Amino acid sequence: MYRLLGPLACLALAWFFTWAPSGRCRCRPWETCWPSVADWSALNESMQGNLIRIRPVASVCHGSEYEAAACANVSNMVVDSGWRASNPRTLQDWIWETGNTAQESCFDTTWPGYHHRTSDCHQGRIPLYSAIVESTSDIQSCVKFANHHNLRLVIKNSGHDTAGRSSAPHSFQISTSSLKTISLHENFVPRGSTTGHGPAVTLGAGVMQWEVYAHGVKNAYTILGGECPTVGAVGAFLQGGGVSSIKSFTKGLAVDNVLEFQVVTSNADLVTANENENQDLFWALRGGGGGTFGFVAQATIRVFPDDPVTVATTTIKAAVTNTMFWTEGVRELFRLVQHFNDMHIPGQLVMTRPTTDSMQATLELHFANTTDEAHVTRLLNSQLRPLTLHHISTSTLVRVQERESSELRTKPDIYPPHYGIVAGSVLISAATLRKAQGQSHVASKLSQLPLGSNDIMFTSNLGGRVFENSAIDISLHPAWREAAHLITLVRAVEPTIEDRDSQVSYRNLGDPQEKEFRDRYWGTANYARLAAIKAKWDPHELFMSKLGVGSENWDEEGICRKSLGFVERLSAILKLERWKN
């Protein structure tokens, strides 16, 4: 009898594993809930043929998928940031295209030591399908489809992300790359209001920074945007807070300047969020993070005059072994920033290691509405004497730009070969820098960070208007209103999981393994409020973003809820193995 019970128990257990409920997980390709070919075809037809089945971009360089001409094209284009931004098969930070191991990867042909023709291309974290939406009705159709089939939904804007939020295994992607509307308003009146808020621009979800900058050049305006030209203007940059390294000091954060959102919610409704309508959603989208509360189809943002600016640059250089580079040089540059901030002049400090034997730090100051080059030179030189006393090599350059937009980059970046990045950042409070030894303390701490030859460390100047806008209620951590700088370290890495960094405060440049993300990014009170708004607008958590509001309820990839039982987890593993085989 016992001999019989063994096989019967195994059969019963196997039957249970096969048919165990998967309601706590998103549907995956090996499960019966996965959309049929007919389902995908119907969605494609409703979108005028803009649904595509995708493979990693380098698949044409591997195994049976190899195509010589297509592979050569990938090798040529793979370093182009603009190409990566518009391509649903790629991300900017390449490390997030792969899985946890090299066996879950699909590298391009230029990667050294990798045998492409004889190796298979693995999907990794690249979604299985991408919908290239062209209208709000397309977005609504995709949201309904994802809801109906319980799919893991991801949104790809430009793919700039330090935690891989634009992709996930076995997922369905909505790409914003065709939503390029740009409309300029002389005096924007938000819906539900009778009062104009001055000049503004409405941007579609797929507009990149360089595109709105170029439009601004033609129409004599600028916006509060980031420095990287291929970052999306409406996506996670804006919804995550939006920091400009130079302009935030005089114009605030991006979320301080957004006037209205148009949002497709998780039940596929199209709603407006501003100070008059759906105020809770408006608050959440002003710092609560992208891809979390709904699909932002467009946003309207305040614009500023394209005024002249005089840019003054001071560069110091020293040998790596010269400790005075940090203790005196960098410390003095921080003092200079503080001095000019007190005169309402913003600045950014950038530290690099141009060679293995040398260090370099550059301070760039922006004198707005100033064209008197001689005056700026005198102001700068009057503050540089301490650097010369310490025999630190110093050079300066002052140049006048007729328009502030001349300083904005309107060309996509070209990355170095085999280049991937991780980033970490931390806020430095104004109170810390104003202490007697505050600048020395910060310089000393920065000197302890290992800076490689392809790494870059830079400050984003806060304070100023960011502090003055304290009355504006946003969902970012309250510490932003008290900070003097955001300090960011960007490190070059190979595309592997193991080299990812830690310890940050800005979600847009955050640690993908941050355990205390709720407190670090938003603070206890703000997070509780955000969680309640998330529960109202997205009760089934369709919009799930890594280290985003509500993500603590899910596994790392947003596939299964953490409350999934042992039996259900084992069932999922067995199904996956059968699907692979």
From Swiss-Prot:
Region forming the signal peptide: 1-25
Any GO MF annotation of the entry: oxidoreductase activity
Glycosylated position list: 44, 73, 369
Keywords: Alkaloid metabolism, FAD, Flavoprotein, Glycoprotein, Oxidoreductase, Signal
Pfam families linked to this entry: BBE, FAD_binding_4
Required co-factors: FAD
Record EC number: 1.-.-.-
SUPFAM superfamilies recorded: FAD-binding/transporter-associated domain-like
GO biological process, one term: indole alkaloid biosynthetic process
Record-annotated FAD-binding PCMH-type domain positions: 122-306
Keyword Flavoprotein among UniProt keywords: yes
Domain of life: Eukaryota
Family, per entry: Belongs to the oxygen-dependent FAD-linked oxidoreductase family.
Name of this protein: FAD-linked oxidoreductase easE
Organism: Claviceps fusiformis (Ergot fungus)
Gene name linked to the record: easE
